[in-house]
Curated annotation (Swiss-Prot):
Residues where Mg(2+) binds: E69
Gene Ontology, cellular component aspect: cytoplasm; microtubule
Family: Belongs to the tubulin family.
Primary gene name: tubb
Stored InterPro entries: Beta-tubulin_BS, Beta_tubulin, Tub_FtsZ_C, Tubulin, Tubulin/FtsZ-like_C, Tubulin/FtsZ_2-layer-sand-dom, Tubulin/FtsZ_GTPase_sf, Tubulin_C
Predominant location: cytoplasm
Biased composition (Acidic residues): 429-444
Protein name according to UniProt: Tubulin beta chain
Species of provenance: Xenopus laevis
Source organism, top-level taxon: Eukaryota
Keywords: Cytoplasm, Cytoskeleton, GTP-binding, Isopeptide bond, Magnesium, Metal-binding, Microtubule, Nucleotide-binding
Region (Disordered): 421-444
């Protein structure tokens, strides 16, 4: 079967990673000891994508937990599903990265990276046919961003033909841990542009706004934000974990979603939005779900899709519903908002339906959009980066670990290039292409 090896790095990565395993274990009927107690063959049909079947019929996540300090991993180990993970797959240092990208990427992280790669090899060897890797991490800290991107490039070297997929939490001043987040995030994006095939941008700004505005939580905690993240991660991996036709593996998803190699930053969305522990009173209809999931308020990246255009879209509907109605509603959205979809990629909206809904909901839909509006997120980070960098504020923490200012300048310009590329395709029309071809013919 086509397996995926999951890696979680740093505090944020381990917290959202642990939530992800709680949610999908529940969906597949697997309890905290790794024993199956499910009620449907669909749950086991593709279980081997994310789980290894060990002796005694126990299912063990193909997960590797990495951090430069023991704290977060101790709390994962003592958390609700802490005993399900393979004990050898906890790899941690003692020093911490102190929210410093350079420590994660060049010094402390570089010392630990070989022991992580040993575990990665061991997991990859037990796979029948490895399709790729997924990493959960944040871009604002030191370990997830610095060491996370180091791991990506090392794994890329060793497994160049496997898909690399990340769930990357983008920092925001509204939920900020550290003042140097813009530096860490820019240095990380510089790596992600080159070394990943698909990156889901999970934006703390958007998560905060959803909790505050939609769910009416006055002081959202990380627990509330992570509840949204785990619902989204469960949704975007549905096609990988349950039987179905569309985007059934990471490579097919990449082929459908990524028209140009650098533009692989996706905006996830989810509907209906519910707060932790709440029950849904009435099932939404398919038209309501479709309308909600295309709404800017339901996006997990703080970008307004109406400020850009969609290059490609994938939607995953979950629960028992009429396929015909789903197709009609999706066509309806495209016809009514045709200006928001680039016309030079016909049929750029794909829909999948899975019978098993998430826990506590009758129906739900997850949205994956490759929209040029994602440039707003990169612009936001870039502005914060430039404000500090032009005064060389806090730079000594990075140069002290052996980094050069040049690397900052390169990362800054790479991110600005990315923004211009998105803008270029936002402005491109099908007609321009024809003019372009005519010019080429004249020159020839």
């Amino acid at each position: 079967m086509r397996e995926i090896v999951h890696i979680q790095a740093g505090q944020c990565g381990n917290q959202i990673g642990a939530k992800f395993w709680e949610v999908i274990s529940d969906e597949h009927g697997i309890d905290p000891t790794g024993t199956y107690h499910g009620d449907s063959d669909l749950q086991l049909d593709r279980i081997s994508v994310y789980y290894n079947e060990a002796t005694g019929g126990k299912y063990v996540p193909r997960a590797i937990l990495v951090d430069l300090e023991p704290g977060t991993m101790d709390s994962v180990r003592s958390g609700p599903f802490g005993q399900i993970f393979r004990p050898d797959n906890f790899v941690f240092g003692q020093s911490g990265a102190g929210n410093n990208w350079a420590k994660g990427h060049y010094t402390e992280g570089a010392e630990l990276v070989d022991s992580v790669l040993d575990v990665v090899r061991k997991e990859a060897e037990s796979c029948d046919c490895l399709q790729g890797f997924q990493l959960t991490h944040s871009l604002g800290g030191g370990t997830g961003s610095g060491m996370g991107t180091l791991l990506i490039s090392k794994i890329r070297e060793e497994y160049p033909d496997r898909i690399m997929n990340t769930f990357s939490v983008v920092p925001s001043p509204k939920v900020s841990d550290t003042v140097v987040e813009p530096y860490n995030a820019t240095l990380s994006v510089h790596q992600l542009v080159e070394n990943t095939d698909e990156t889901y941008c999970i934006d703390n700004e958007a998560l905060y706004d959803i909790c505050f505005r939609t769910l009416k939580l006055t002081t959202p905690t990380y627990g509330d934000l992570n509840h949204l993240v785990s619902a989204t991660m469960s949704g975007v991996t549905t096609c990988l974990r349950f039987p179905g036709q569309l985007n059934a593996d990471l490579r097919k998803l990449a082929v459908n979603m990524v028209p140009f190699p650098r533009l692989h930053f996706f905006m996830p969305g989810f509907a209906p939005l519910t707060s932790r522990g709440s029950q849904q009173y009435r099932a939404l209809t398919v038209p309501e779900l479709t309308q909600q999931v295309f709404d800017a308020k339901n996006m997990m990246a703080a970008c307004d899709p109406r400020h850009g255009r969609y290059l490609t879209v994938a939607a995953v509907f979950r629960g028992r519903m009429s396929m015909k109605e789903v197709d009609e509603q999706m066509l309806n959205v495209q016809n009514k908002n045709s200006s928001y979809f680039v016309e030079w990629i016909p049929n750029n909206v794909k829909t999948a339906v899975c019978d098993i809904p998430p826990r506590g909901l009758k129906m739900a839909v997850t949205f994956i959009g490759n929209s040029t509006a994602i440039q707003e997120l990169f612009k936001r980070i870039s502005e914060q980066f430039t404000a500090m960098f032009r005064r060389k504020a806090f730079l000594h923490w990075y140069t002290g670990e052996g980094m050069d200012e040049m690397e900052f300048t390169e990362a800054e310009s790479n991110m600005n290039d990315l923004v211009s590329e998105y803008q270029q395709y936002q402005d491109a029309t099908a007609e321009e292409e024809e003019d372009f071809n005519e010019e080429a013919e004249e020159e020839a």
